[in-house]
Each structure stands twice: as C-alpha cells, then as structure tokens.
C-alpha cells in the first residue's frame, strides 16, 4: 500500500496501529501494509467498525482487549490480517474483510477475481490484462 494511505490509516486508527512504528524485532507491522492500494477501503471500513465496537462496548462498562494489528499482507490472493485482541464481533468483521478481498482488485478496488495460474493475485479485468497471469 502506498505510504500516503498507510499514514492515513495510522492517523485514523492509532490504537489498532499501535505497533506500526516499532522495530522488526518486535512486530511484522513495522513493514507496513504489504498489499496494493485497492484494498484500502476494505481495511478502512473494517477498522472503523472494529474500533467503534470496542469503544462502544468499553463505554458501557464491559471490557474488550484493544485490537492491535501485528501484520497485514496479501497471501494467496487475499488480504490476511494478523492481530491480537477483540472478540467474536471484531473477529467476524476482520474475516469478512479478508473474504471480500477475494472479490476485490488489489490494485484499484474494482470487482476482481483470482488469476488461474502463476502467482495468485486478485485483480479486475483491466489489471489482469495489464499484468497477464502473474
């Protein structure tokens, strides 16, 4: 993901991104988001839902451990989010974002599909044509 979009998510969700500026000996999140810009909206929406849920539940006197991203990357053509904290709701939101990435172009965010052979990437028709079966 571009440094600009990475920074935007860090600013909007500082609690989720608490490990973003730590070193490689402490977290894989130090490398940033390891995927294309097309999944930005999926992540932004998921992070907004996760943080608002945690804030709402904690305000009501219950306690949910803060979700903290440990690594976010493309793996086998889909978004993969490693994290700690949360509950079944936050887990469901993050799994839904991962599943939606299987149908979203990693480069531009348009509807997409995984390529049939080669390095698995989920791309729209335009980006499949641009890159071929990479």
Language model region names:
Residues 3-7, 11-92:
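Interaction interfaces in information-processing and related assembly proteins
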Residues 54-58, 62, 102-106, 132:
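Residue-level signal for secondary-structure boundary elements
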Residues 73, 92-103, 114-118:
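Short, flexible, mixed-charge glycine/proline-rich loop motifs
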Residues 83-85, 101, 112:
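Short leucine-rich amphipathic alpha-helical surface patches
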Residues 105-108, 124:
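Short cysteine-rich clusters marking metal-coordination/redox-active sites
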Residues 109-112, 121:
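Basic (Lys/Arg-enriched) interaction patch that binds polyanionic ligands
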Residues 111-114, 129-132:
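Short functional micro-motifs and their immediate structural scaffolds
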Residues 118-130:
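Cysteine-rich micro-motifs
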């Amino acid at each position: 993901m571009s440094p600009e979009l990475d920074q935007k998510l860090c600013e909007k969700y500082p609690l989720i991104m608490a490990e973003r500026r730590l070193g490689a000996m402490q977290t894989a999140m130090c490398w940033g988001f390891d995927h294309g810009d097309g999944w930005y909206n999926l992540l932004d929406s998921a992070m907004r839902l996760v943080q608002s849920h945690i804030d709402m539940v904690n305000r009501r006197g219950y306690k949910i451990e803060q979700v903290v991203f440990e690594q976010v990357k493309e793996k086998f053509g889909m978004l993969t989010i490693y994290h700690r904290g949360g509950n079944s709701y936050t887990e469901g939101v993050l799994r839904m974002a991962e599943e939606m990435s299987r149908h979203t172009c990693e480069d531009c965010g348009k509807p997409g599909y995984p390529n049939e052979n080669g390095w698995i990437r989920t791309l729209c028709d335009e980006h499949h044509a641009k890159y071929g079966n990479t």
